[in-house]
Amino acid sequence: MTGRDLAGGVPVLRRLGGAEVPAVRDRLVETYTAVFCAPPWDDSPARAVRFAELLDGWARQPGFVAVLADDAGRETDAAGRGTGADGAPVTGFALGLPTPAPFPADRAYGQVRRLLGPAVETLSDWLEVAELAVHPVARRAGLGRRLLAELTADRPAWLLTVPTVAGTTDFYDAAGWIRHGTGYGITIYTNRPLSR
């Protein structure tokens, strides 16, 4: 099966709010597992369980947004959005939520603070790209860029990635994101310049 087989040509993207996530949660976890529990990431199945827990928490946060690409895009509602009613595989997704103010210190946020110093406060209220995943069968067709662009639209956004995984920094560099630092096992990117 190819990305075109899964997506019926060019995948249709649809935007979901947090209240809509429970209906697609299992499909997102399946795609996450296919992406991150295989090379080049090689995460453990326990990491997929942790992703499901994080997803549940993120979806309850005000301002959470998910952008999905799936085969269900061929069926649309009155607004022209894919309905997803048939449970089609998710070929890719991007997840984001507003960054709290003041900038958090838990999880990887402390490493981001150490890398950016005082400029980190600029990221408060920006959209944090919490996850971007493209199913292996749908890669190399521009879907990752489309998902990222749809998620961030005209909003200031930031993300972190793991530079030791082949292709991650090349992807964001080629997509025009601005690299702001590498250290502590992460690389930080924004889609616009930071105020210093």
Label the model's feature ranges:
Residues 63-94, 135:
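Conserved beta-hairpin
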Residues 1-26, 30, 34:
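Conserved N-terminal entry element of GNAT/NAT acetyltransferase domains
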Residues 53-71, 98-106, 128:
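A short helix-loop-beta-strand connector motif used in the catalytic cores of GNAT acetyltransferases and
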Residues 145-146, 163-185:
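Conserved active-site alpha-helix within GNAT-family acetyltransferase domains
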Residues 29-45:
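Helix-loop element at the rim of GNAT/NAT acetyltransferase active sites that forms part
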Residues 131-153, 173-174:
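Conserved acetyl-CoA-binding loop-helix of GNAT-fold acetyltransferases
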Residues 95-131:
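Conserved acyl-donor/pantetheine-binding loop and adjacent beta-alpha core of acyl/acetyltransferases
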